[in-house]
Amino acid sequence: MLRVRCLRGGSRGAEAVHYIGSRLGGSLTGWVQRTFQSTQAATASSRNSCAAEDKATHPLPKDCPVSSYNEWDPLEEVIVGRAENACVPPFTVEVKANTYEKYWPFYQKNGGLYFPKDHLKKAVAEVEEMCNILSMEGVTVRRPDPIDWSLKYKTPDFESTGLYSAMPRDILMVVGNEIIEAPMAWRSRFFEYRAYRSIIKDYFHRGAKWTTAPKPTMADELYDQNYPIHSVEDRHKLAAQGKFVTTEFEPCFDAADFIRAGRDIFAQRSQVTNYLGIEWMRRHLAPDYRVHIISFKDPNPMHIDATFNIIGPGLVLSNPDRPCHQIDLFKKAGWTIVTPPTPVIPDDHPLWMSSKWLSMNVLMLDEKRVMVDANEVPIQKMFEKLGISTIKVNIRNANSLGGGFHCWTCDVRRRGTLQSYFD
């Protein structure tokens, strides 16, 4: 089984157990060791009649609006984000650790202000066209409520302005008939959930499960205030050592650091997702789902779907610039690993929150249809060779806000059932 191999991957697995345990302390060492062991106990517990009630494996309520188990079943309903009123986040330590140095002056100058008006206008138009095309493809589209993100707020621990509701993938995760609100890790995203509450309440009234992960205080202790990030080399060394700007003070995670493949969900420790956050998700979803920690050669890990994007049963896009340390284990499990071509986005195009690899941040409408950027001809040809039809949409200006098609959406309902692809 892949779980055994993936989470006991030779010396890397042993090193991870030792490192995570030492970082989190003795009280949490046990769960780390259990995570890196066989799933025999989990399999046995899943047969226990005590777990029979209220599990995701049970039939969904009739006409439940929420039902999605993976990234590729036929898409029926989706939430698409908004660029309206998007604000540049204040230049705090967690923002600095997640952005490229060439953009730091932009944040220092514009933190708390709206993103450039003309750019936002173009992004809004692109996303509207994306919504229209999704509707024409037979997909129901929902949108978050418009909010003025420039409003300053204060908690007992910090004060900030907001960011946006552009990326529902970052804050919402659908697992079966349950929609989970992530706690987030940026202070500018503390109240981002408010834009989605009217949609989620509607789903809840119609039979969906609704879970809100523990909200972090986002006190100073959650962040390494002296995190050294003067060069890419520094970031590589720190990431290799398992050191990130977020500490283990309290659970935090962005939903976009998890990617689903039926019963198996893969997560990465990143600048915004800590081990406590992953452990919260693991316990919450057990025993029906198995959460695996995987890692990459990535100097700035934040969100998994422009690094490792599962696009079909046994089919994954793996970023050649950020190779997965456990990739051989997927190969041994019989999966096909596809290396996407180099993106063609121009060097002078602003990418304030991301890299050019948003080209692989695609949205699958089903196993044979993919929404891809109209400018990215090389990856279009790659999909065509795989027998996947491309639906071409231009979201180049929307990319500047930090996401591609996968980031800009949260698939709420896909027509399919819960299956295991690794047993």
UniProtKB/Swiss-Prot annotation:
The active site is at D254, H303, C407 (amidino-cysteine intermediate). Pathway: Amine and polyamine biosynthesis; creatine biosynthesis; creatine from L-arginine and glycine: step 1/2. GO terms for biological process: creatine biosynthetic process; learning or memory; muscle atrophy; positive regulation of cold-induced thermogenesis. GO terms for cellular component: mitochondrial inner membrane; mitochondrial intermembrane space; mitochondrion. Disruption phenotype: Knockout mice do not manifest aminoaciduria or glucosuria. Keywords: Acetylation, Membrane, Mitochondrion, Mitochondrion inner membrane, Phosphoprotein, Transferase, Transit peptide. It comes from the Eukaryota. Transamidinase that catalyzes the transfer of the amidino group of L-arginine onto the amino moiety of acceptor metabolites such as glycine, beta-alanine, gamma-aminobutyric acid (GABA) and taurine yielding the corresponding guanidine derivatives. Catalyzes the rate-limiting step of creatine biosynthesis, namely the transfer of the amidino group from L-arginine to glycine to generate guanidinoacetate, which is then methylated by GAMT to form creatine. Provides creatine as a source for ATP generation in tissues with high energy demands, in particular skeletal muscle, heart and brain. This is Glycine amidinotransferase, mitochondrial. It comes from Mus musculus (Mouse). The gene is Gatm.
